[in-house]
Amino acid sequence: MSISLGNAFIKNFLGKAPDWYKIAIISFLIINPLVFFFVDPFAAGWLLVVEFIFTLAMALKCYPLQPGGLLAIQAIAIGMTSAEQVKHELVANIEVLLLLVFMVAGIYFMKQLLLFIFTKILIGIKSKTALSVAFCFTAAFLSAFLDALTVIAVVISVAVGFYAIYHRVASGQGGTPSHDHTCDSNVTDELSRDDLENYRAFLRSLLMHAGVGTALGGVMTMVGEPQNLIIADQANWMFGEFIIRMLPVTAPVFICGLLTCVVVEKLGICGYGAKLPENVRNILEEYESEERKNRTNIDNAKLIIQSVIAVWLIVALAMHLAAVGLIGLSVIILATAFTGVIEEHAMGKAFEEALPFTALLAVFFAIVAVIIDQELFKPIIDAVLAVEDKSSQLALFYVANGILSMVSDNVFVGTVYINEVKTALLDGVITRDQFDLLAVAINTGTNLPSVATPNGQAAFLFLLTSALAPLIQLSYGRMVWMALPYTIVLALVGLFGISFLLEPMTTMFYDFGWITHGTIEAATNAVSSGH
């Protein structure tokens, strides 16, 4: 049936997004200029922020780049901010953009090593509880040095591989290379179907443990999450100092996070507790044994090279030898040069995962520019900063960041809050020591409670929108339900750390000489976003 040209334009607008979503975005684009010019620019600014958060919350209906980008372009066009201010934000946060472009691509060329590690873990550990802790801990360790998105990408590729191996055998097509593991129609044996359902539940729980692990590790270092880099840059902290300043909160949270992993597996609550079926284990062990036999010296040489590059990566990051993105670029060069990847099309695949998110981050910064120009957060920040009790001030910042990060993206929230606190410091409203404590509250507030929903953590959203999610029946609701015990524990232990441990332990670190008191001059010299 032919379609009219007018209907074709409507159908093409935001593609397969539901009609109600398209109408909502068009309504936003009509309402915003009217409110800005005829009601109040401040109200229009807040309306834009709410609309942008809506596009993030509806990320499964439509990737937020397109609707969020349209809102951002209109905001610049009608004068809510300027293209120059957006450029200023991008330049100020160039390290984050470099991280996303080069580091994620760099790790792509080390996938063989990471796949090898996770394969050994999955096959080698018989206890489900121990395996869950191992996945959570390994994901946390890797996320402390690498990007959480990359770690989740690796875990997903491992899980898809293992799922496909068993599905092929269960479908009676063990030797078929072109087997479609997304179709269950050939899995007719009831025993195989039961095993498949249990295996799906097993993989779901492992992926959620790994996902939370990326949050546990990601909060600890300045390279763990994109907003950490922004906060470290504004505070003028180096790699080591960032870790030490976060320890009063991150250490108890990490321990309690791993304990939560054990408890949910032992009790079998919130969708956890599924064990690896024996039939599946036998099939996977046979596969791993076959792979080991077929591994050539070429493959071994690649694994050795990638191991050496991994050591270089950790040392370079720990010693802050260059901007994180540039270290990522060095990984791309070393990994491709020494493993023989020299064709342009082979290299291009490495950049596919990160670039859409990098573009979305640029749109975030356009919204941040509006928030700065319209001074949207000023009343809230002023109210929190006006609280005389410093401990209450820290707790309020943590809670405010946490709640916003559950519904919005934590990069966006962290950027906005650190900008406002930096302004307060430069205006003499707070001391440099209080600024440092607030920076810790902002960093932990954006990283820990945000595990509640896929909207908050980019790694969770990446998992939810991956090809694996429908295979193992991981829906939005199921993800929120499985994250619930972690959300409660991480948020409350984080709040306890902010309220009772942060100030005394930071004072102790000063006394030990592990960190030194910062100066306002140092913060002024750091690249200042939005000023």
From Swiss-Prot:
Task: Write out the GO cellular component annotations.
Answer: plasma membrane
Q: Which organism is it from?
A: Aliivibrio salmonicida (strain LFI1238) (Vibrio salmonicida (strain LFI1238))
Q: Which residues form the signal peptide?
A: none
Record-given protein name: Na(+)/H(+) antiporter NhaB
Task: List, alphabetically, the NCBIfam families matched.
Answer: NhaB (TIGR00774), PRK09547.1 (NF007093)
Read off the InterPro entries from this record. Answer: Na+/H+_antiporter_NhaB
Record keywords: Antiport, Cell inner membrane, Cell membrane, Ion transport, Membrane, Sodium, Sodium transport, Transmembrane, Transmembrane helix, Transport
Name where it mostly resides. Answer: membrane
Q: List the disulfide bonds.
A: none
Family, as annotated: Belongs to the NhaB Na(+)/H(+) (TC 2.A.34) antiporter family.
What chemistry does it catalyse, as a reaction equation? Answer: 2 Na(+)(in) + 3 H(+)(out) = 2 Na(+)(out) + 3 H(+)(in)
Q: Where in the cell is it found?
A: Cell inner membrane
Q: Name one Pfam family in it.
A: NhaB
- Identify the PANTHER family for this entry: NA(+)_H(+) ANTIPORTER NHAB (PTHR43302:SF1), TRANSPORTER ARSB-RELATED (PTHR43302)
Q: Tell me what gene encodes this.
A: nhaB
Q: What does this protein do?
A: Na(+)/H(+) antiporter that extrudes sodium in exchange for external protons.
Molecular function as annotated in GO: sodium:proton antiporter activity
Parts of the chain that traverse the membrane: 13-33, 34-54, 90-110, 121-141, 145-165, 206-226, 242-262, 308-328, 352-372, 394-414, 456-476, 482-502
The membrane topology noted for this protein in its Swiss-Prot or TrEMBL record is:
Multi-pass membrane protein
Q: Does the keyword Ligase apply?
A: no
